[in-house]
Structures are given as C-alpha cells and as structure tokens.
Design a protein with these regions (language model features):
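N-terminal secretory signal peptides that target proteins for export/translocation
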Residues: 1-10
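Bacterial N-terminal signal peptides
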Residues: 14-25
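A short beta-strand-turn-helix
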Residues: 35-56
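Short active-site neighborhood of thiol/selenol oxidoreductases, capturing the structured segment around
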Residues: 50-69, 173
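Short, thiol/selenol-centered motifs that function as redox-active sites or metal-ligating centers
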Residues: 62-72, 95-96, 135, 192-195
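Structural microenvironment flanking redox-active thiols in thiol-disulfide oxidoreductases
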Residues: 69-109, 117-126
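Short, internal strand/loop/helix patches
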Residues: 106-147
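Thiol-/selenol-based redox modules, centered on thioredoxin-like
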Residues: 139-140, 144-198
C-alpha cells in the first residue's frame, strides 16, 4: 500500500476513533487459554508463550490506516529501546490483508518488528483492542496491564497536536517492567476501527 489513500477508501475505513470510555483501572487480567495469531508464513504463534518471561507489547495496525502509519517511526523506536526486556509484535487484524501486502507495508514504513496476522481476532479479544493503532502491554506473567492509545498526538481524526504531551505506551511499558502488582489501565485510542468478522 502506498501513502496515498482514495477518498472513498478513507470514508469507508476511517471513522472518528475516539472511544467513549474514560481512563479507568480494574484488576489486571491474566493470560490463561492459548491465544494465537499467525506469522507471515502461516504458522500459529502465541506471542505471550513465545516471550520467555519478558513483557509483551502488541501494536494493532493496518496497512491502509494513515494514523497508524504516522506512528511507524515511534513504534519502531520504542521496540528498539526496549528490545532486551520486551517483545514487540505488529498485529494485523484485517483478514483481507495477506502476508505479501503486510511484508510490503513493513518494508515501506521501515518496520523491523515481527508481524502477526489475526484474522480470527483472537489477539484482538485478548487485548480488548478496538482501534488501529492501539497498543496492548502484558507483563512478564502474561497479565494485560494496559491497552489503548500510544500517546495523545491525535485529538481526533481531524486534529493532531504538533507534538504529544502524554506518552501512555512508554509509561505502560515502564510500569509493566517494574515488577509491581499492576491494575489494568486503558486510555481511548484515535484511529481506524477494527472491523468485526464477517
């Protein structure tokens, strides 16, 4: 996919992605059942079981979402920064995006993060994700500690700040790595809605 988007595609795929929920905390949820996506070779992968005791960060993206594409440099930067202590995965929840399209997208935007397809939305449900881009952070025990926006760069789909003033994903990773008993936190994301399975 290129960086240009046809207007009809924009109207179809990009909706005002601010969720109505506000910031809240509840008990962190644990990962019990096997939840898998598929790597680009079609092999099932459970990113939490593959972590070997590290924190896990899932970033939900899609190839044709301009908001998530704008975040690509920051997502890669955070992955590089935390590489020794956290596993990052790009998760593509749109079942229409095949492996070759995803490979092309990752090359175009400079991603070096492993990618997973999530056509059955197993990881979407596990992470409670609704938007791309949206991040989910799991601590080393597999508990979901955070899901929501990466930062507050976008006010809504039509407005963005010159620079972010809060950095929720970075803060959530630091908290997950602290080893403290965490509660689940969330912050509304702005972007493209994840479509329901047809």
């Amino acid at each position: 996919m290129g960086r240009r988007f046809h207007s009809f595609r924009w109207r179809k795929l990009i909706l005002p992605g601010i969720l109505t929920a506000s910031l809240f905390s509840v008990s962190a949820t644990s990962h019990n059942a096997q939840e898998t996506g598929f790597d680009l070779a079609g092999k099932p992968v459970d990113p939490l079981k593959a972590a070997n005791g590290k924190a896990v960060v899932l970033i939900f993206v899609r190839t044709d979402c301009p908001v998530s594409n704008r975040y690509a440099p920051l997502i890669q930067k955070l992955s590089d920064e935390y590489a020794r202590r956290a596993d990052f995965w790009l998760v593509y929840p749109d079942k229409k995006e095949d492996a070759e399209v995803i490979r092309q997208h990752d090359r175009e935007y400079g991603y070096k993060i492993p990618a997973l397809r999530d056509p059955q939305h197993a990881l979407v449900k596990l992470s409670q994700a609704q938007i791309t881009p949206e991040a989910a952070v799991f601590d080393a025990s597999g508990r979901l500690a955070y899901h929501g926006r990466i930062d507050d760069l976008y006010v809504d789909m039509a407005r963005s700040r010159r620079a972010a003033t809060t950095h929720e994903l970075d803060d959530a990773i630091k908290a997950a790595l602290s080893g403290k008993n965490l509660t689940l936190a969330t912050k509304p994301a702005v972007g493209c809605y994840i479509s329901d399975l047809e």
